[in-house]
């Protein structure tokens, strides 16, 4: 009960005052994520049809936009965005070393959050269970690589949710179905939902690139296999249907932008002949045709979606030593029975 039926006053008025004060302090300290978390919590104590709920919802949407931009509101001190900081540190390393360095940077900058899930019993035990199931099918080395790849993908979602101040559970592994995260609060806008949704494949792409970098350095075929399968799983997640990540990423795109994604999918199918892309093209084209969107064009979302389609599709072609190259139709690979 949020409102007293007799006096019509808010039941949680004191909690609302406390949360508002904490949110204001966080904003003054330029802690936008902390402010978002407090304002979202305050929404839970307000009737949805109240003016206060509408006002705070608008506040959440505004703060979310600032978090997404990587900048601070005009009253705050300026700071470089994550992309600017990364660009300043970029060096002219070789391909393999660049991928390995990127993985190390990810571990150093996000290591605390990346390892956070392992401190939760539910995540750790379901992770071990999934590892055991996959071990019996593919062996322990591939099973370990697959589970870690899925874990990194899911922690991408966790980090994005934390960045926007959205409460959620840690990953829970389900053998054969990957893993899932339960959101305790909902994104405030299609763009926010898209950032959270595409964060998983983006981190998954990083894991696949790191595995391929290790393969280039060591020559061990198992790393090529982990990289290729990880890329395929993340590409599958880009199917633009709920509740997959692609369905969430598609929400923020205008109709014109959706057709650009369809063109990218079709173009990568022409290059790679990856059968999964046919399904992606069909579903994405159907949504672009059948749905009328009223959202403003989302350039960042379009860039992320297109980047993921192109890179993950290309990585599905990674050759694994000892296995036939993907889509090889030569007579030697087809077999003549001789």
PLM regions: where:
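Conserved small-residue packing positions in alpha-helical repeats and bundles
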Residues: 23-24, 61
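Inward-facing hydrophobic residues that define packing positions of alpha-helical scaffold repeats
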Residues: 4, 39-40, 46
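Cys/His-coordinated zinc-binding microdomains
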Residues: 5-11
């Amino acid at each position: 009960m949020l409102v007293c039926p007799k006096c019509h006053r808010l039941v949680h008025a004191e909690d609302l005052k406390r949360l508002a004060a904490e949110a204001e302090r966080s904003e003054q300290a330029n802690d936008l994520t902390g402010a978002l978390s407090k304002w979202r919590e305050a929404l839970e104590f307000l009737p949805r049809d109240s003016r206060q709920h509408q006002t705070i919802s608008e506040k959440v949407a505004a703060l979310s936009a600032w978090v997404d931009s990587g900048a601070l509101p005009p009253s705050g001190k300026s700071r470089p965005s994550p992309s600017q900081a990364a660009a300043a540190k970029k060096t002219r390393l070789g391909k393999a070393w660049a991928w390995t360095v990127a993985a190390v940077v990810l571990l150093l900058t996000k290591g605390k959050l990346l390892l956070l899930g392992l401190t939760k019993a539910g995540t750790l035990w379901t992770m071990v269970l999934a590892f055991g199931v996959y071990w019996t099918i593919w062996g322990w080395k591939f099973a370990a690589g697959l589970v870690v790849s899925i874990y990194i993908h899911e922690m991408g979602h966790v980090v994005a949710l934390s960045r926007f101040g959205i409460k959620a559970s840690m990953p829970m592994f389900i053998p054969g179905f990957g893993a899932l995260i339960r959101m305790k609060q909902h994104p405030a806008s299609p763009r926010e939902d898209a950032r959270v949704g595409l964060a998983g494949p983006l981190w998954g792409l990083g894991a696949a690139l790191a595995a391929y970098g290790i393969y280039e350095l060591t020559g061990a075929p198992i790393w090529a296999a982990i990289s290729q399968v990880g890329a395929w799983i993340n590409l599958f997640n880009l199917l633009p249907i709920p509740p997959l990540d692609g369905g969430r990423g598609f929400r923020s795109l205008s109709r014109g932008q959706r057709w650009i994604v369809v063109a990218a999918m079709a173009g990568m199918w022409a290059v790679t002949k990856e059968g999964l892309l046919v399904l992606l093209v069909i579903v994405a084209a159907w949504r672009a045709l059948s749905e009328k969107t009223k959202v403003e064009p989302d350039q960042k979302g379009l860039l992320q979606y297109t980047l993921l389609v192109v890179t993950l599709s290309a990585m599905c072609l990674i050759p694994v030593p000892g296995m036939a190259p993907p889509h090889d139709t030569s007579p030697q690979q087809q077999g003549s029975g001789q």
